């Protein structure tokens, strides 16, 4: 009891809601300073990391966040109903895996431990042709697609291994690969192209919030190549798998503890409810106009999702290539739907809670239970075409469709949760989708080289600008660190 009175211990043990209140209380309440060395736009993980690194260099920093909270695409949800044990689940980015060294280091520094995603037992595959099967491994044992899928995934790995993660557009085949969608390439190279594409949708819908027909092949190869670090080549399985993959672990208490603890340390560097409306560069400085006032800075780091950058009024105008890039980057469409049960009953049946369905609302399903194992939580990623079909339905109809998808995998008990929670990222004004902004065909080769290129005194962060683990929390950390280095070198 007595030790918890110490501020440090108390801060470390605060849950999401209490930390959120503490961050809001510690953030800047009054007028903004008229001048700063650097302004960071965006209070997601990337912006917070950039602000911390700049402050560590001794710079006077102001961080402007549009929302009344920090975390961006990382968001905890606190369960409060009977039988839920007050558990926390993640409505946004959640997973961490091998080679995601930068987010791992940050979490360790902030005292946020990880736990293994439950992975004991079999996964479930539901096919509209062959019915329900239990399996182990990466690819379901569907005889109509397995030979094709194995060959194509091997080819994806070998093509991705040739990609320069810092300049994917420089590959000799870049123009050819960027001219086609992943879906077109699959159909051209598989005997059962439709079947393989249907399976790959169960990877692209959660991972990109998009379908194979929307994504440039070059972009997808780069995304796979990014699924590693400086000493480990990215592979499809490291991106898609649980064991030894990007879904291997989660954070105890939920991933939003990381940005919340980071923001609490930054104190009044953080200003909430301060959407940036105009950025003008003149006379060797940058004027940042926000809803909370104007700040003059020597440098600015923009760490907002690419589509939102278009909503800022720029003077002078953004360079043509940067403007075209932003216009061609589309946020994925994604929502997360969680059903909560008193226990993870599927584990009793020897199942790990992971499932793939080639149709319906619940195409890709994970065990989203907290570390303690209770309550049991099943999570469906509803993305891309599946979001377009089910995202428009009334909540009750969508809930029924998701639960029916769970029941097809795990039995009738899945129809009777004690709670149901959903979060539609397309409805978030300051994100507009998720989990990442994607490259349509023809975008990367023509405009991709602008992604990190500073614009005068403006630098770019955000997970989309990372050369490793783009689209992930690790990419967000890396991008924030890189942007801070750029600013430090150009003071």
Predicted regions and their residues:
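FAD-dinucleotide binding site
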Residues: 2-491
């Amino acid at each position: 009891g007595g030790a918890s009175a110490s501020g440090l211990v108390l801060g470390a043990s605060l849950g999401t809601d209490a930390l959120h209140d503490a961050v809001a209380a510690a953030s800047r309440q009054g007028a903004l300073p008229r001048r700063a060395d650097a302004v960071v736009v965006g209070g997601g993980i990337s912006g917070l990391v950039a602000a911390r690194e700049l402050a560590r260099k001794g710079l006077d920093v102001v961080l402007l966040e549009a929302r009344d909270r920090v975390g961006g695409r990382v968001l905890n949800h606190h369960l409060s109903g009977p039988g839920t044990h007050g558990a926390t689940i993640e409505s946004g980015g959640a997973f961490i895996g091998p080679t995601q060294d930068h987010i791992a280091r940050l979490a360790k520094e902030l005292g946020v431990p990880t736990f293994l995603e439950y992975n004991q037992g079999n996964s479930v595959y539901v096919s509209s042709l062959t019915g329900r099967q239990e399996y182990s491994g990466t690819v379901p044992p569907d005889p109509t697609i397995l030979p094709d899928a194995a060959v194509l995934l091997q080819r994806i790995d070998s093509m991705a291994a040739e990609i320069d993660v810092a300049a994917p557009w420089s590959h000799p085949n870049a123009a050819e690969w960027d001219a086609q969608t992943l879906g077109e390439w699959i159909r051209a190279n598989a005997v059962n192209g439709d079947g393989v594409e249907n399976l790959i949708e169960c990877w692209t819908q959660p991972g990109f919030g998009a379908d194979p027909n929307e994504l440039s092949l070059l972009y997808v190869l780069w995304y796979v190549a990014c699924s590693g670090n400086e000493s480990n080549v990215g592979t499809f399985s490291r991106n898609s798998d649980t064991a030894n993959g990007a879904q291997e672990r989660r954070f105890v208490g939920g991933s939003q503890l990381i940005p919340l603890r980071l923001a609490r340390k930054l104190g009044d560097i953080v200003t909430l409810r301060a959407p940036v409306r105009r950025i003008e560069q003149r006379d060797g400085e940058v004027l940042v106009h926000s809803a909370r006032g104007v700040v003059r800075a020597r440098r600015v780091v923009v760490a907002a999702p690419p589509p939102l950058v278009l909503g800022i009024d720029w003077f002078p105008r953004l360079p043509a290539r940067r403007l075209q890039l932003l216009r061609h980057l589309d946020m994925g469409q994604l929502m997360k739907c969680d059903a909560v049960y008193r226990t993870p009953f599927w584990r009793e049946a020897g199942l790990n809670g992971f499932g793939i369905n080639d149709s319906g609302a619940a195409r890709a399903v994970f065990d989203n239970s907290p570390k303690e194992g209770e309550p049991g939580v099943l999570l469906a990623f509803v993305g891309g075409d599946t979001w377009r079909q089910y995202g428009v339905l009334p909540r009750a109809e969508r809930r029924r469709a998701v639960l029916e998808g769970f029941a097809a995998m795990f039995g009738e008990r899945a129809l009777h949760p004690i709670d149901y929670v959903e979060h539609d990222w397309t409805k978030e004004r300051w994100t507009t989708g998720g989990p990442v902004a994607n490259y349509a065909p023809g975008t990367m080769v023509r405009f991709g080289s602008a992604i990190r290129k500073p614009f005068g005194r403006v630098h770019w962060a955000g997970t989309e600008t990372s050369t490793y683990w783009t689209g992930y929390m690790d990419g967000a950390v890396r991008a924030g660190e890189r942007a801070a280095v750029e600013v430090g070198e150009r003071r």
